[in-house]
Amino acid sequence: MKKEKAIVVFSGGQDSTTCLFWALKQFDEVEAVTFDYGQRHRLEIEVAASIAKELGVPHTVLDMSLLNQLAPNALTRSDIAIEQNEGQLPSTFVDGRNLLFLSFAAVLAKQKGARHLVTGVCETDFSGYPDCRDIFIKSLNVTLNLAMDYQFVIHTPLMWLTKAKTWKLADELGAFDFVRTKTLTCYNGIIADGCGECPACVLRRRGLEEYMKEKEGANQL
């Protein structure tokens, strides 16, 4: 894969930044694409641009504001509480988001002569999001290939990793400190370790604590 080109779907969060570092190890040419869909915290786009610049990765921001008109949600509307009720999808779920993001990323990739798409979706800690499932990604890969008569390959390096394993991967890629201090995962728009209270921060912190405990245990052997 080294001599080929990849497009990373990039939000500037822990998962997509880890995937960006992964892609930089796997491919000769890497570009990032970020989608502006009216995020509640505009800082997300700024963080993504800053990280891409620091890593020397060409970065494209695409306007997807239509998505917010179609599917209002807690990530774009301050009047919608961030919550998850039993038996229901979290209020942070955006209908069609990964479907649209990967479809537009594929169009961009084809224009740029790239056939590899990289996304940080994960089924292990996926919070019930249906568009983070492996079966969806595989299905979409086939659909995109048929729709554009092109041989895309969608890579999901985190698909079967817990959050602790995602921290481990970042460490193995030499990106642990970078990911911990420079990424934005928090739903309340706080960089690095975040607010510590929203679902994204709780998941991130729990994974970090689990990984650090495992690492300390291994070092004591």
Curated annotation (Swiss-Prot):
One Pfam family in the UniProt entry: QueC
Coiled-coil positions: none
CDD domains listed in its UniProt record: QueC-like
Residues that, per the record, bind Zn(2+): C186, C195, C198, C201
Pathway: Purine metabolism; 7-cyano-7-deazaguanine biosynthesis
Molecular-function annotations in GO: ATP binding; ligase activity, forming carbon-nitrogen bonds; zinc ion binding
GO BP annotations, alphabetical order: queuosine biosynthetic process
InterPro entries listed in its UniProt record: QueC (IPR018317), Rossmann-like_a/b/a_fold (IPR014729)
Disulphide bridges: none
Swiss-Prot/TrEMBL cofactor(s): Zn(2+)
Catalytic activity: 7-carboxy-7-deazaguanine + NH4(+) + ATP = 7-cyano-7-deazaguanine + ADP + phosphate + H2O + H(+)
EC number(s) given by UniProt: 6.3.4.20
Residues noted as binding ATP in the record, renumbered to the chain: F10, S11, G12, G13, Q14, D15, S16, T17, T18, C19, L20
Quaternary assembly: Homodimer.
Family classification: Belongs to the QueC family.
Identification of the protein by name: 7-cyano-7-deazaguanine synthase
Organism, scientific name: Geobacillus sp. (strain WCH70)
Native organism taxonomy: Bacteria, Bacillati, Bacillota, Bacilli, Bacillales
